[in-house]
Amino acid sequence: MDRDEFAASIDHTVLGPETTWGDVETILNEAADHGMNACIPPCYLPEAADYENAPKTIATVVGFPHGQHAPGVKRDEAVTAWDDGADEIDLVINVGRLKAGEDDAVAAEISDVVAAVPVPVKVIIETALLSDDEKRRACEAAVEADADMVKTSTGFADGGATIRDVELMSEYLPVKASGGVGSYEEATAMLDAGAVRIGASSGVAIVEGHPGDGD
């Protein structure tokens, strides 16, 4: 994978509760300058939409970080995010519903968001909290709901992306590996395992580790 293609697979991310507009500006500038995407909190989308040095793709999160919003709230949050300029939506499932065996409710919630916005929806299943069977069922719900991608983690649970989880999830949909990916080597390992996108707060270091960076 050449340097530009590799950079375009990175979602350079800032989503902490203490995130300021200044932090978002830094992420936008770094993403644009290095050819990455950006993933930012929804409250900063209006400013980001008007920002001069913005990357081509700006993603945001819905139902973040625990996924326990009411379904209608998630749908409305997604619509607002799209209206405010989001190019992609990263949606957190209700893990409790999944663990209780309410897979139809999980799929319906995802479907509501997918139907409400004309942009790609990535479904965050929070792998660190799930058994392998639950991971498979979460991916099946995402497939049933016509989601575009499944994503490993929010970064707020213990544990992040693993090679094993990426391999499992990629049997169902394209995968975004997120959580604990901090170097070029780690990102490449995830891509080799089947991921098509990487979410990371250390996107600059990851891209600068590519052998073709600076050519």
From Swiss-Prot:
Active site annotation, chain numbering: D90 (proton donor/acceptor), K151 (schiff-base intermediate with acetaldehyde), K176 (proton donor/acceptor)
Superkingdom classification of source: Archaea
Pathway(s): Carbohydrate degradation; 2-deoxy-D-ribose 1-phosphate degradation; D-glyceraldehyde 3-phosphate and acetaldehyde from 2-deoxy-alpha-D-ribose 1-phosphate: step 2/2
Gene Ontology biological-process annotations: 2-deoxyribose 1-phosphate catabolic process; carbohydrate catabolic process; deoxyribonucleotide catabolic process
Recorded GO CC terms: cytoplasm
UniProt GO MF annotations: deoxyribose-phosphate aldolase activity
Keyword Lyase carried by entry: yes
Catalytic activity: 2-deoxy-D-ribose 5-phosphate = D-glyceraldehyde 3-phosphate + acetaldehyde
Keywords carried by this UniProt record: Cytoplasm, Lyase, Schiff base
Record EC number: 4.1.2.4
Subcellular localization, as worded in the UniProt entry: Cytoplasm
SUPFAM superfamilies membership: Aldolase
Matches recorded under InterPro entries: Aldolase_TIM, DeoC, DeoC/FbaB/LacD_aldolase, DeoC_typeI
UniProt similarity note: Belongs to the DeoC/FbaB aldolase family. DeoC type 1 subfamily.
Physiological role: Catalyzes a reversible aldol reaction between acetaldehyde and D-glyceraldehyde 3-phosphate to generate 2-deoxy-D-ribose 5-phosphate.
The name this protein goes by in its record: Deoxyribose-phosphate aldolase
UniProt organism field: Halorubrum lacusprofundi (strain ATCC 49239 / DSM 5036 / JCM 8891 / ACAM 34)
